[in-house]
Amino acid sequence: MTEQVRVAITGGSGRMGRTLIESAKLSSNIYLGAAVERAGSTLIGVDAGELAGVGAMNVAITDSLDNAVDDFDILIDFTSPEASVVHTDWCSRNGKAIVIGTTGFNHAQKEQIAAYAENTPIVMAPNMSVGVNLMWRLLELAAEVMGDYTDIEIIEGHHRHKKDAPSGTALKMGEVIAEVLGRDLEKCAVYGREGITEERSRETIGFSTIRAGDLVGEHTAMFADIGERLEITHKASSRMTFANGAMRAAFWLGDQGPGLYDMQQVLGLKD
């Protein structure tokens, strides 16, 4: 097994990027080889550790992966769907693995990334949290036992800056439940309700979205019957939980061949 892996972090100056840098410094099996920011940023040349508030790490922020091609083996990417596709293409052409925590991909972008996985080791997950990945397993059980006779609603909340809605985690929750029940999420999902609506169909899965303040991430799946309801909830209080999960994924990916993996495999929750 690999003892230590060298990583690069894209979007190094963002909220998640700085948290990833901090997590890398605290991880004994991770070595930060590079941190990348967009061209023209005033932070180019700044020490990544000092930027993240964890002390100097002797890694200067650079504006191109090409400048750091010899400094890392695995890229950790929490940027935007468009940027993540570009970064995955770069990794595919340069013999690098990649951990993708970006959300908001459309179907075509997901297919592009899957194609790159034919020659590139990729971990792609809408949520790197251990607790969230365990929640998905609990949702499978709840859907098996209660899904056919309850009304299912998914409620999620994030900070005011989050751009995609519903969150990737919420959509994954819906996908997990729909798969167990033999439903097509694209056909049974209901995104918000307004005005006078018809009586709720039990075949649907509802989604509600909250964007407010500095919420890190809260997700609830509700299985509601007459007289009782089951709620399965995960609340994140710090981005560090996602960053630590990304480091765990990067370390695991260091021993894997080409393929498209997810956090369930990283955590040993499925083959």
From Swiss-Prot:
Pathway where it operates: Amino-acid biosynthesis; L-lysine biosynthesis via DAP pathway; (S)-tetrahydrodipicolinate from L-aspartate: step 4/4
Q: Which top EC class is named for this enzyme in its record?
A: oxidoreductase
* Cross-referenced Gene3D superfamilies: Dihydrodipicolinate Reductase, domain 2 (3.30.360.10), NAD(P)-binding Rossmann-like Domain (3.40.50.720)
Report the CDD domains cross-referenced here. DHDPR_N
| Claim: NADP is one of the keywords in the record | yes
User: According to the UniProt entry, what is the EC number of this protein?
Assistant: 1.17.1.8
Q: Name one GO cellular component term.
A: cytosol
Question: What are the TM regions of this chain, as residue ranges?
Answer: none
Q: Where does (S)-2,3,4,5-tetrahydrodipicolinate bind?
A: 159, 168-169
Q: Spell out the catalytic residues.
A: 158 (proton donor/acceptor), 162 (proton donor)
**What is an example of a Pfam family matching this protein?**
DapB_N
**For this protein, what reaction is catalysed?**
(S)-2,3,4,5-tetrahydrodipicolinate + NAD(+) + H2O = (2S,4S)-4-hydroxy-2,3,4,5-tetrahydrodipicolinate + NADH + H(+); (S)-2,3,4,5-tetrahydrodipicolinate + NADP(+) + H2O = (2S,4S)-4-hydroxy-2,3,4,5-tetrahydrodipicolinate + NADPH + H(+)
Give the GO biological process terms. Answer: diaminopimelate biosynthetic process; lysine biosynthetic process via diaminopimelate
Residues involved in NADP(+) binding: 38
Subcellular localization: Cytoplasm
Q: What is its main location?
A: cytoplasm
Q: What InterPro entries would the database entry show?
A: DapB_C, DapB_N, DapB_N_CS, DHDPR_bac, NAD(P)-bd_dom_sf
Give the domain of life. Bacteria
The record lists NAD(+) as bound by 11-16, 37, 101-103, 125-128
User: Where do the coiled-coil regions begin and end?
Assistant: none
Function, as annotated, reads: Catalyzes the conversion of 4-hydroxy-tetrahydrodipicolinate (HTPA) to tetrahydrodipicolinate.
HAMAP family under this entry?
Answer: DapB
Membership in a protein family: Belongs to the DapB family.
Q: What is this protein called?
A: 4-hydroxy-tetrahydrodipicolinate reductase
Query: Gene name on record?
Result: dapB
